[in-house]
Design a protein with these regions (language model features):
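Conserved helicase NTPase motor core
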Residues: 2, 178, 182-288
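Short, structured coil/loop segments at alpha-helix boundaries
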Residues: 14-20, 75-82, 97-113, 153-156, ...
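Generic detection of intrinsically disordered/low-complexity segments and helix-coil linkers/edges
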Residues: 38-40, 50, 126, 133, ...
Length: 288
């Protein structure tokens, strides 16, 4: 495998295309190409766990083809980002609900209720935003209310500390979201993606080329590994359609041949193994 990769990179250096040389200059250590080799192999191996590795690889490259903020907002990449943000905000909301229950419980710091209500309003307002650009602005301007002083001597100190600790956790969630996703403006993010796009395009091409050359070499030497068996099984048992992968005629014959299919350690299966299992299963066709 490493021999194939080294030979491929040597050929690319001899060809001397600007796109490759720019990529190599950006990602090699200067002394050797180990970093580039490791990157290609890592992405190649990861892509092989997907039923349509080519489509997955293209989707990764496509994520960098963002001309403007409007396109960024509509991208699948940004939809995943927004979903993750909303999930974290929901976690924050649940924490605040717990804090309010503690504050209003017997011997609890009820004086904190007003502050917790304001905190909840901050989280709810952030959660209601559907635009990444508007959310970036909102996170930049988040302001927390000062917590009221507790003067009730009957309140348990333990409950005071519990509420304060939960409140700090909530603030931490918001701070982490801001640091992870809003460290720069949407316009700056678009410019960064544009700058990285040529390198990612070249990386995708290198992964594809390596896959082709590696498969050719294994065929020439009559070598097959477990990952190859998965890929060949998928090609035999499925056909690609507009709706994704559907069972081939051969798979349909297996569906009629077997009454039950059992799989060991199902929780450890990957997406390609799931696709193979579904191809010979009758569940999707409504048959038990």
């Amino acid at each position: 495998r490493h021999d194939v990769l080294e030979d491929m990179l040597e050929e690319k250096y001899q060809e001397g295309s600007k796109s490759f040389l720019d990529f190599a200059a950006a990602y090699s250590t200067g002394r050797d190409d180990k970093k580039i080799e490791d990157l290609i192999l890592k992405i190649y191996e990861f892509s092989r766990s997907y039923p349509d590795s080519e489509a997955w690889l293209e989707s990764c490259v496509e994520a960098y083809r963002i001309p403007d903020v409007e396109t960024l907002e509509k991208s699948s990449f940004m939809q995943k980002v927004m979903a993750d943000i909303r999930k974290n905000l929901e976690d924050a909301r649940e924490l605040l609900a717990q804090a309010e229950m503690i504050a209003l419980s017997p011997d609890g710091p009820a004086v904190y209720e007003a502050t917790l209500d304001k905190d909840m309003l901050v989280i709810e307002e952030l959660s209601a935003i559907r635009s990444y650009e508007k959310m970036a602005e909102a996170f930049t301007n988040v302001k927390w209310a000062r917590i009221a002083a507790n003067k009730d001597q009957t309140v348990l100190e333990e409950k005071i500390e519990q509420v304060k600790k939960i409140r700090e956790l909530v603030k931490g969630i918001v701070k982490n979201i801001s640091g992870q996703y809003f460290y720069e403006s949407p316009q700056e993010l678009v410019e960064d993606l544009k700058m990285c796009a040529p390198a990612m395009e070249e990386l995708g091409n290198l992964v594809r080329l390596f896959g082709e050359k590696f498969e050719e070499q294994k065929r020439a030497q009559n070598i097959i590994d477990f990952s190859d068996m998965e890929q060949y099984a998928l090609r035999i048992l499925t056909e690609k359609s507009e709706d994704g992968f559907v069972p081939s005629k051969i798979a349909q014959e297996y569906q009629n041949q077997f009454h039950e299919v059992m799989i060991d350690e199902y929780q450890d299966s990957n997406l390609i193994q799931e696709a193979i299992l579904n191809s010979v299963s009758t569940c999707r066709s409504g048959r038990d």
